[in-house]
Amino acid sequence: MLINDVNKVKVGNIVFGGKKRFVLIAGPCVMESQELMDEVAGGIKEICDRLGIEYIFKASFDKANRSSIYSYRGPGLEEGMKMLTKIKEKFNVPVITDVHEAWQCKEVAKVADILQIPAFLCRQTDLLIAAAETGKAVNIKKGQFLAPWDMKNIVVKMEESRNKNIMLCERGSTFGYNNMVVDMRSLLEMRKFNYPVIFDVTHSVQKPGGLGTATSGDREYVYPLLRAGLAIGVDAIFAEVHPNPAEAKSDGPNMLYLKDLEEILKIAIEIDKIVKGV
C-alpha cells in the first residue's frame, strides 16, 4: 500500500504525501471562459469544503498538442494567467496549469502554485530545468510511452536542478492504436522514488485520436479506476470536471459531470479511510 512516508511537498497550506487524506486537483480541461471557470471552481470548492477535501483548481491556458489544427487551444498565456489570478482571488484556492516551453515557466510561476509538465513533454530536459528553477512544486505526468521506472531519470533531472518539490502523475499507457490502459503497478513503482504520486483518472480513459480529429474516451471507466487508485493509496486524484462535458471544447468524452462529483468523492473518502486509516 502507498501509505509509507515520502518527501512531502507543500503547496500553500496543502501537503502532498504521508498518511493523510487525498488531495483533489480538478477543473475543466481548457480555459473556455471566465464564467465557466468560476462555475467549476466554485462548485468543486463548495463540495470539497463540505467533505473536508483539500482542493487545487486546474485548467490549461493552451492545449498545444490538440489532434487537429482547427481545434480550440485556449486563451493563451497572458490572458490565461489573468483568468487564473481571478480564480485564486475569488475562491482562495491554489492553482495548477501546464507549461509547454521553457520560456513559459518563469511567467506561469508568477501565478501558478504548481507547474505541470505534460506527459508528451516529460523527457524534455530544458523544460524540466526551467520548471525546477522557478522553485515551485512541479507535477510531472508520466509519458504514455514510458515505463514507470523510467521516471527515475526525470526525477534526477529535477533533483540536479535543485528542486525536490516533485510530484509524479500516472495518466495511462499506450495500448495499441487509439487506446490506453492503466497498469496499477505504476503507482507503486513511482512511489519508490520517494515522492508523492498523483492519479489522473480522466486522461487515463482517453482514446487518443479516437474521433479522427479529436480524442475520445470512456467515462464509464473513470469510476472503477478511481476506486482502484485509492485502494492502492495515492496521494492525490487529478480529474477533469465540467458542467456539461458534451459541450466542452476539449476532452469532453472522458470528463466528469460536475453534478456527479460529490457522490463520487463521498465513496472516495470511505476507501481512503480504510486504506490509510485517516
Curated annotation (Swiss-Prot):
Keyword terms: Cytoplasm, Lipopolysaccharide biosynthesis, Transferase
GO CC, one annotated term: cytosol
Pathway info: Carbohydrate biosynthesis; 3-deoxy-D-manno-octulosonate biosynthesis; 3-deoxy-D-manno-octulosonate from D-ribulose 5-phosphate: step 2/3; Bacterial outer membrane biogenesis; lipopolysaccharide biosynthesis
Reaction(s) the record says it catalyses: D-arabinose 5-phosphate + phosphoenolpyruvate + H2O = 3-deoxy-alpha-D-manno-2-octulosonate-8-phosphate + phosphate
Subcellular location: Cytoplasm
Enzyme class: transferase
Gene Ontology molecular function, alphabetical: 3-deoxy-8-phosphooctulonate synthase activity
UniProt keyword Translocase present: no
EC numbers, comma separated: 2.5.1.55
SUPFAM superfamilies for this protein: Aldolase
Family matches, as Gene3D superfamilies: Aldolase class I (3.20.20.70)
InterPro entries per record: Aldolase_TIM (IPR013785), DAHP1/KDSA (IPR006218), KDO8P_synthase (IPR006269)
GO annotation terms (biological process): keto-3-deoxy-D-manno-octulosonic acid biosynthetic process; monosaccharide biosynthetic process
Family to which the UniProt record says this protein belongs: Belongs to the KdsA family.
Protein name: 2-dehydro-3-deoxyphosphooctonate aldolase
Species this chain originates from: Fusobacterium nucleatum subsp. nucleatum (strain ATCC 25586 / DSM 15643 / BCRC 10681 / CIP 101130 / JCM 8532 / KCTC 2640 / LMG 13131 / VPI 4355)
Name of the gene this protein is made from: kdsA
